[in-house]
Amino acid sequence: MLKFIQNNREATALLAIVCLFVFPGALDSQYLSVQTLTMVFSSAQILMLLAIGATMVMLTRNIDVSVGSTTGMCAVLLGVMLNAGYSLPVACLATLILGIVAGFFNGVLVAWLKIPAIVATLGTLGLYRGIMLLWTGGKWIEGLPAGLKQLSAPVFLGISAIGWFTLVLALLMAWLLAKTAFGRNFYATGDNLQGARQLGVRTEMVRIMAFSLNGGMAALAGIVFASQIGFIPNQTGTGLEMKAIAACVLGGISLLGGSGTVIGAILGAYFLTQIDSVLVLLRIPAWWNDFIAGLVLLGVLVFDGRLRCALQRNLRRQKYARFISPPTPLQTEAKTHAQQNKNKEVA
């Protein structure tokens, strides 16, 4: 049972999503609708994109806490260029390039300069946030063109063009990780760095690629953010890095690297966003959101840790069982006889 849960974390996340629909649905039948599904998905698109990027980094046994600032910085560049008269495709392309460059810089710090990922990305978190504020002077960016907002308008089955793009991108990344040598390199790097090097995997380039892809996903998240709300606050992206990591952990991505899937991370992002919608239904104040999300994350971490310990004990038991010979019938009979004599003496 424990092994099944560990090997099917996506199913566990999906079950949690279903339960989180059923229980509120018992209180309000209108909650159980396709409209609710699409509404939560629309709200989860930003976090899903960030979770895809975080998956790539976490698979290599690293972590990036600068994606929130990268998202904000890229959103600001998009807004500045659009208000300066650049076309939407050009502005989006420049935004994507900026995100990839920001991620590449993180990767260089970690892979080539050997700075611990948490330290390097904490530094760039402040750097990218500072660049964002310098560009805007601390002001909000408003007056974005209608063409940008149109990207988030429903086009089919209540899902926007950006929503369909997010789904296709998630499926593509899931396929790349599961079915190609490119994806297996990420797992190998995170699972056994030295072993991957001996097999010829260019682990430094894999990690740089992971951070670069993460930056690209953060840029896409910035575009989605701007298109959904129609303006860019000066605190755009704040706190998103923790939610992205939480979504990955909820979906079964190991903090120790080398295991997990993009689909699990997507389901984790959906579940976290769904919690917010349930809190609204229950009329719980918004300031409880972070507390409850953190509580859920801690619960999952504790469960994940206990599950891993139980699996390791089971593996050790199976590994050394062949060295422990079972007792012979004569030994069993002698032990039983000795126990009976001991019981008589006590009586």
Curated annotation (Swiss-Prot):
Keywords: Cell inner membrane, Cell membrane, Membrane, Transmembrane, Transmembrane helix, Transport
Molecular function terms, GO-annotated: transmembrane transporter activity
GO cellular component, one term: plasma membrane
Entry's induction text: In the absence of AI-2, repressed by LsrR. Induced by AI-2, via release of the LsrR repressor.
Membrane topology per record: Multi-pass membrane protein
Pfam families per record: BPD_transp_2 (PF02653)
PANTHER family found in the cross-reference section: ABC TRANSPORTER PERMEASE PROTEIN YPHD-RELATED-RELATED, AUTOINDUCER 2 IMPORT SYSTEM PERMEASE PROTEIN LSRC
Subunit description: The complex is composed of two ATP-binding proteins (LsrA), two transmembrane proteins (LsrC and LsrD) and a solute-binding protein (LsrB).
Protein's name according to its UniProt entry: Autoinducer 2 import system permease protein LsrC
Species name: Salmonella typhimurium (strain LT2 / SGSC1412 / ATCC 700720)
UniProt lineage: Bacteria, Pseudomonadati, Pseudomonadota, Gammaproteobacteria, Enterobacterales
